[in-house]
Structure formats: C-alpha cells, structure tokens
From Swiss-Prot:
Protein name according to UniProt: Enolase-phosphatase E1
EC numbers: 3.1.3.77
Gene Ontology MF terms: 2,3-diketo-5-methylthiopentyl-1-phosphate enolase activity; 2-hydroxy-3-keto-5-methylthiopentenyl-1-phosphate phosphatase activity; acireductone synthase activity; magnesium ion binding
Gene3D superfamilies assigned: 1.10.720.60, HAD superfamily/HAD-like
Enzyme class, broadest EC rank: hydrolase
Amino acid sequence: MPVRAILTDIEGTTSAVSFVFDVLFPYAREHLPAFVRRHAAEAEVATQLEAVRAESGEADADIERVIEILLGWIAEDRKATPLKALQGMVWEQGYRASALKGHVYPDAVATMRRWKHEGYQLYVYSSGSIQAQRLIFGCSEAGDLSPLFSGYFDTTSGPKREAASYVRIAEAIGRPPAEILFLSDVLQELDAARAAGMCTCGLAREGGELDGHPTVSSFTAIEPAAC
C-alpha cells in the first residue's frame, strides 16, 4: 500500500533538540510564573491550572504552589498536557513579540515543501501542544511553514510510545496506518508506530542506527515512495 501521508515528530527530527532545551524551555521557565499570575483568572488558563492540581494530586494548591509544580515539571522535562498547554501560551507571546523564531532544519524545510508539491499530506505529532507546534512552524526562521501541514497531533491523542496513539491518529487522518510514514529520532516511538501498522523512518542526525527501522541523517535521504 503506497504512502499517502507523512507524520513527523519535531524535536530531534524537523528541529534541533537544542532549540527546545536551550531556547524554548528557558524562555518558558523565565516567563511562566508572571504569565500564570497575570492570567490565572482567565478561563483558558484557569482550566489548565485545575488540570495541574488534578494531575499533581494537590487539589487545594494555590497559585504559587501551582507555579512551583510547573517549574518542577519543566526541570524534569515531564510530558504533562497542562504544562505543555501553558508553555504554548507563553511561547505564543514570545513568537508574537519576535523574541522567538522556530528552528527547522533547512533539509526538512526543502524536503517537506517538495513532498507537499508532490501531493503528500503532512502532519505533525509531538509531545508539545498543538499550539506550540503551530508556532514553531508558523513563526519559523524559514518563514510561515504552516501551509505545508494538514493537521497536528499532541499528547491528547495519547502517549507517543503507545501503539494505540498511532491507531487513533490514523483514524483521525482517515487513512489506513500502512499509508502513513512516521518520522522520529526516538526508537520507542518508531516501534509504537510500526506496531500500529505505519511505515517508519528514523532520523539520526549525528549518525548511527535506530534498530529495526530504516535510518537516515537528513530529510533529503527519505523516499516515501520506497517505503
């Protein structure tokens, strides 16, 4: 069954891990406390603060305690959905103020543009919130790349290391898993996607292999038609 859609990870795949850890996370860590204090009463933020209380098991946590929990999760690189949502809100302010520009590897930009021209549907699946995904590509160093993508998926579709998440994504895309090529730099994610029936290709930008999966160091080496 030929590949018709391409689902890509971001961190370590389309974009440098260092951009996330050296730029985005420090920016969120610096600006999140003031953002939460300023906007805590707004419905969108308040919903996420309640989710933090629920996930942490501290139903009575005040705003300052919630901030402490969030900063702890950032330090742990915890994939908590309410944290990702709040980080996305903070990053949006940074992008809109031109304090942040999304990093996307030039080879990924050029190849995804070619794939779009060739008729492939492109989708993103990342542990970062959909809002954060849109910002990385919509406010990137290469300009607005959002027209390339047909949709975005985050942890609301399920954990990235569980096959069921990829089954749900295939259903949302409306294609059999065998028609979808998944790209990632994480072996366990590739294993989960393959278990769901997707084609896979690993990105090892510093070289090496992702056991059991075709592995490349650049998007230019990926041939969806050969999967």
